[in-house]
Amino acid sequence: MAFFEVKELTKSFDDTEVLKGIDFTLEKGEVLAIIGSSGSGKTTLLRCLNYLETPDTGRITVDGKTYFDAEENKSLSESEIRLRRLHFGLVFQQFNLFPQYTVLDNLTLAARLQRCDELKKMYKEKRLTKVEYKQKKSAVRSEFNEKAAALLEKVGLSEKADFYPCQLSGGQQQRAAIARALALTPDILCFDEPTSALDPELTGEVLSVIKGLKSTDSTMIVVTHEMEFAANVADKIIFMANGIIEECGTPDDIFNHPKSPLLQSFLGKSAYTD
């Protein structure tokens, strides 16, 4: 069994079928690039993987464990969905940093709240004494600040920890958003057009960070319009069209030996050259 499997995933909005039976697998440490024209279903697929949308049918497994099953999902509570969502990190097009918090707090807030909820549950279940609960809770901030500092160093933002998002360039904000997604140690990190909101001169710094993550064996799914990036970084590429996977293969398969007329046309319009 592959590390990550998606089987027969479908999603409709009213009478519009957006995903029409999506199937693919991904091994741990691999990078998958998803390409295709606007409206092909790429972003909806990412949103389904992250429980931001609920698929109508299908099954998703992560490391041999069921992450989503259409029948089982009907009985999941909101808290269970939140826990499952932690398997995936998602970096949006528009950064989505909290403007009222510093870069450091943006990285640590969700993780700190998650840990405090876990400690509270352990205390209520009498697995922690009151003294132990208070001691561990008071240590949460320093613990996650230390982890966040290491992540900021990884994305080249160590000196910006105490800055607010409005004080950063677009590229720096997106790098902070990547670090924030990593802070929750997801099994799979997803990117939805991570450079689409950036000026061309800032695109390179964000793509460089993503390339660096590959060297750490991070498993990633990247929806992108950067064909050169997909060709150089991805282990496999999916081309989506009209809600289906029209073609899937290695970068060499997709860019040098495309079979689908739709893919051939798409690559011609993208002006990609090897």
Question: Which residues make up each language-model segment?
Answer:
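Helix N-cap at the start of a conserved alpha-helix in ABC-type nucleotide-binding domains
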Residues: 200-202
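Conserved signature/switch motifs of ABC ATPase nucleotide-binding domains
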Residues: 163, 184, 216
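Conserved ABC ATPase signature
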Residues: 164-168, 172
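Catalytic Walker B motif of ABC-type/P-loop ATPase nucleotide-binding domains
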Residues: 189-192
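A short, surface-exposed alpha-helical micro-motif characterized by mixed small hydrophobic
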Residues: 230-232
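Helix-to-loop junction immediately C-terminal to a conserved catalytic motif
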Residues: 50
